[in-house]
Design a protein with these regions (language model features):
Chain B
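A short amphipathic helical element positioned immediately N-terminal to and/or at the very start
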Residues: 1-9
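Hydrophobic alpha-helical transmembrane segments of multi-pass inner-membrane transport and secretion
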Residues: 12-39, 243-279, 300-309
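Hydrophobic, regular-secondary-structure patches
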Residues: 26-106
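Transmembrane alpha-helical interface segments in multi-pass membrane proteins
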Residues: 29, 277-322, 336-344
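Membrane interfacial helix motifs at helix-loop boundaries and amphipathic/re-entrant anchors
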Residues: 35-45, 49, 62-64, 230-250, ...
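Hydrophobic secondary-structure segments that place a key small or acidic residue at a functional site
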Residues: 90-93, 98-187
């Protein structure tokens, strides 16, 4: 996808409410946020603060109860599930906290899963996967199954998968929670390198303050409310 | 890269429970089908081969060939009925045949015929010569041999082979009417028929004539002493035919249903295990339809592989079964089972559809 | 109870399993019922007649209907030492008119008071004079007092008695005197010069065992084959081939039941490994988990059994098999024990898996969820 001059992500008064019986839980309370087309934003907060919910809404995995969500010019807040599926396929990339690689697929095949579900050119997709594997220093491990890879290598495959569909926005959930400090730093460097190289925007959710210096801007979220922490 | 096929290839043991169950069920289905076909062919071969659209019986025989008697006068009446083109006499006797060099006797049905049935040459020139059904080869019968029939050991010699001409599960022997009368007189002196009397008549109708109408006309012309039916009606009236068909089909249909349930259960359990992966797939943009297509593809592949192995199993079982058990495998029955298995497998996998649709992609991230 | 709560929360899974097992059990039961009814329909009449030794012509291949003996051979058999009573037995299939309908019956003619008469009657009395007959009552085609004639005409026979489980060659049977048999055969085929008996029914003299007598008859009269009644029933045409075919079908069905039960409970157990490990870690003894599993197995098998028996009753009423299907409770009980026993054997593997769970695995598991 080309670069859009407009914001990669715009949240306007987004609110997410869960109802169970008579009780009401407000996961996100009137959050507003704007992420530039090549900006990296870190979202920091304790568990239960709503940061994962906010990430899900930004990526079209959840619809907000109220408010507008605009990703690279597409207003997705009103999309039905089918349209949201297409949106996710074409416009965003995810890196999940629990890696979530398919255990019976090789590293390369795990990358190709993303383009398998779209009507993209198979040869181009394969070339792209190989290129990503090289950039992530995984060429030697391209034909290995996840159980044959180290924790750090698996995380790198997951990062590569997020870029396979050339997204406008990459959403990353706790990338370093399962890794030690040194490995965590390596993965964050890799993520930032890839994001910068492609001019993509990224929102990284983390509770690890040591990693926030990788982002252009850090925001705090507590009990569903977004505030400003010091920018880096 | 097809996800479904890759999983089948890389994790085959995962699918073992369903495959093993379906292999055995295929074996069951093919064996059931083979028994049904074998029984049907072995009972009805001789009648199915008869020339002409109609068969005329004595009306008091309840469509039994063996108990039917049609005398020369009645035959003449039948020949004169308009719409009748050709009439031929047919007779049979069921008895045991002693085969040279064999300890067990074979059960045979000796036929005397005027008009050659399909696949059978004209009656042999000499009395005492017969064609033998190829199923008798399993009992050690060879061309050129002389078989001794009945308690008085009447000799007949085999001068050629015919196939699919058995009657009531007894091996068909086909000779001229003289041969038949002589054997009848030798083996069953209390059942002999006067010269010119046959058991049934095979009747061909003229072109353009309606067989049902001609049948009615024949029975009217003989004053109700005959019962004329179409050949297929006669075949279905042989003892046990319709009952075998309904019984076996009930068991076969139940077995197909079991296959569907086994596949359904298997994929329900598999889908439960895959909820995590499926949520991730949906998060990166896979639709429920695409995921479900993978499930259906796996169900079809499992059915196909199970069928092939099951067919080998059935063939092995068939080889071990003694010739007295009327088991006949045919390509059309095999195709029927294969298609049925694929359809049932697909239907079974459809039970997981709702579960796949309900998977929420948001769970991938939490 | 955790076990039943799990079933209640996942009705589809357990429903499918109970349904599949139930249908398979039904297949086993139905085929078993079919088999015993078929075998009885082939040879019930033979079993029910009084001759404990039956003598056929030797080329008849143990087939009563294919056997025919000349009267002098009957005489020779009767004079073999060890013979208590001997009498000619006629067997033939005939078309008769009963209640205005043409039906095929197996006609068995025996001399009154001599071997070959039916031994057990359900009502009425044996045929003592020409023109009287005893009918097997399964098909309800006959009632006491009915008059039966051959389709070819001839003197009528009045039903004076009824018996059960006495069919022959899957046809209703009519037991008449030998004279009636002869006259009905002549009426059906006027061309016949004479009517010969099909076999000789023999009761050994006191102190002589049937098998010994059969052997002596074989030795003394070369043109015949003598069989004890048990051998005649076992060797009748269709019996061994039917038994062989059904053996294959029943074996396959029973193996599938055991496999399906075993495999699927194993899968269910493996899927619960995380939860089970947790239970062990918080102190639940292994026996508690195994008991839970077995409770589920018993519940599922119980439901399956109900489904199977229900279908069996429906099927025996509804399917047109052409022969009276009687559910044999003893055979059913044996089949049930075999099927349930094998299923439990299949489940043993799942039990072993449960016992193998190591509570330490609860600690250090990277999270209960996720894929790796």
């Amino acid at each position: 996808m080309g670069h859009h001059r407009e914001a990669a992500l715009k949240l306007e008064n987004v609110r997410k409410v869960y109802r169970s019986g008579d009780a009401e839980t407000v996961a996100v309370d009137r959050a507003s946020l704007e992420v530039g087309p090549a900006e990296i934003v870190a979202l920091v907060g304790p568990s239960g603060s709503g940061k994962t919910t906010l990430l899900s809404i930004s990526g079209g995995l959840l619809s907000p109860s109220q408010g507008r969500v605009v990703v690279a010019g597409d207003e997705i807040s009103g999309y039905d599930p089918k349209r949201l599926t297409r949106f996710r396929r074409e416009s965003v990339g995810f890196v999940f906290q629990s890696v979530n690689l398919v255990p019976f697929l090789t590293a390369r095949e795990n990358l190709l899963v993303v383009t398998d579900f779209s009507r993209r050119d198979k040869k181009k997709s394969k070339a792209r996967a190989d290129q990503l594997l090289t950039e992530l220093r995984l060429e030697e491990r391209a034909d290995n199954l996840p159980r044959q890879l180290s924790g750090g290598e698996r995380q790198r495959v997951a990062v590569g998968r997020a870029f396979m569909n050339q997204p406008d926005l990459v959403l990353i959930d706790e990338p370093t929670s399962a890794l030690d400090t040194k490995l965590g730093e390596q993965v964050m460097e890799l993520i930032v390198t890839e994001v910068r190289a492609r001019g993509t925007a990224a929102v990284i959710v983390t509770h690890d303050m040591r990693m926030t210096h990788f982002a252009d801007r850090t925001l705090a979220i507590v009990d569903g409310i977004l505030g400003d922490a010091a920018t880096s | 890269m097809k996800l479904a096929l890759l999983e089948l290839r890389r994790r085959p043991w995962r699918f073992a429970p369903a495959v093993i169950a379906l292999v055995l069920l295929t074996g069951l289905l093919l064996t059931l089908g083979g028994l049904l076909d074998g029984l049907y062919n072995g009972f009805t071969g001789a009648l199915r081969a008869q020339p002409g659209a109609l068969l005329t019986y004595a009306s008091d025989a309840n469509l039994s060939v063996i108990r039917s008697r049609i005398d020369a006068a009645t035959t003449a009446q039948v020949e004169r009925v308009p719409g009748v083109e050709q009439v031929g006499g047919l007779g049979t006797v069921l008895l045991g045949a002693k085969i040279p060099g064999q300890a067990t006797e074979a059960s045979v049905a000796l036929f005397g015929y005027q008009r050659a049935p399909g696949g059978v040459p004209a009656p042999p020139d000499k009395a005492g010569q017969v064609y033998a059904d190829t199923s008798l080869k399993a009992y050690g019968v060879q061309e050129g041999q002389t078989l001794l029939l009945g308690p008085q050991r009447y000799p007949v010699s085999i001068v050629g082979w015919v196939s699919d001409t058995n009657f009531l599960l007894q091996g068909g022997l086909w000779g001229g009417l003289d041969t038949w009368r002589q054997v009848l007189g030798s083996a069953r002196p209390d059942q002999v028929l006067a010269s010119g009397t046959y058991q049934v008549l095979t009747v061909s109708t003229t072109a353009g004539a309606d067989p049902a109408w001609v049948a009615g006309a024949i029975d009217a012309a003989t004053g109700g002493r005959t019962q004329t039916v179409t050949r297929s009606f006669a075949v279905d009236s042989l003892p046990g035919i319709t009952q075998q068909r309904s019984t076996f089909n009930a068991i076969i249909d139940t077995t197909f249903f079991v296959a569907a349930l086994v596949v359904a259960l298997f994929f329900v359990l598999l889908t439960i295990e895959r909820v995590g992966i499926y949520a991730v797939f949906k998060a990166v943009g896979a639709s429920s339809g695409q995921l479900f297509a993978q499930v259906v593809l796996q169900a079809v592949m499992i059915a196909v592989v199970s069928f092939m192995v099951g067919a080998l199993l059935a063939l092995t079982v068939g080889r071990l079964i003694p010739p007295q058990v009327p088991l006949q495998f045919s390509a059309s029955r095999a195709l029927q089972v294969a298609v049925g298995l694929v359809v049932m497998s697909t239907l079974g996998s459809a039970v997981s559809l709702r579960r796949v649709v309900r998977i929420d992609p948001a769970t991938a991230i939490s | 109870m955790l076990a039943s709560r799990e079933i209640r929360r996942a009705p589809v899974r357990f429903g499918l399993l109970a349904g599949a097992i139930g249908l398979l059990m039904f297949l086993v039961f139905f085929q078993q019922t079919l088999l015993s009814s078929l075998l009885n329909s082939f040879t019930g009449a033979l079993q029910n007649q009084s001759g404990t030794v039956l003598v056929y012509s030797s080329e008849a291949r143990d087939n009563l209907e294919a056997s025919v003996l000349s009267p002098d051979i009957v005489g020779k058999v009767a004079s073999v030492p060890g013979v208590g009573q001997a009498a000619p037995l006629g067997a033939a299939t005939m078309t008769v008119l009963a209640k205005g309908q043409q039906i095929d019956v197996a006609m068995i003619g025996a001399e009154p008071g001599k071997p070959g008469q039916p031994t057990k009657l359900t009502s009425g009395r044996p045929a003592t004079a020409p023109g009287q007959g005893v009918a097997s009552s399964e098909t309800k085609s006959f009632a006491i007092g009915d008059t039966v004639t051959t389709a070819a005409g001839g003197s009528p026979v009045t039903i004076v008695g009824l018996t059960a489980q006495s069919q022959f060659n899957v046809q209703p049977t009519l037991f008449v005197t030998f004279d009636t048999f002869t006259s009905m055969r002549k009426a059906a085929n006027p061309n016949a010069k004479m009517v010969w008996p099909s076999a000789v029914a023999v009761i050994p003299a006191t102190g002589v065992r049937p098998k010994a007598l059969a052997d002596s008859i074989d030795a003394a009269v070369p043109q015949v084959t003598a069989l004890t009644r048990t051998e005649a029933v076992a060797g009748a045409p269709g019996v061994s081939s039917t038994q062989g075919s059904f053996a294959v079908l029943l074996t396959l069905a029973v193996v599938v039941v055991a496999l399906v039960t075993g495999f699927f409970f194993l899968i269910l157990t493996v899927q619960k490994t995380a939860a089970l490990t947790l239970l062990r870690a918080v102190g639940a003894p292994a026996s508690y988990l195994v008991r839970g599993l077995l409770q589920q197995v018993v519940l599922v098998l119980g439901v399956a059994l109900l489904v199977a028996v229900g279908l069996l009753v429906t099927a025996t009423a509804a399917v047109n098999t052409g022969l009276p299907l009687t559910i044999d409770p003893r055979a059913l009980a044996i089949s049930t024990v075999v099927v349930v026993g094998l299923s439990l054997l299949g489940v043993a593997f799942a039990v072993w898996r449960v016992l193998r769970i190591d509570p330490f695995q609860a600690v250090g598991r990277p999270g209960l969820g996720g894929i790796e």
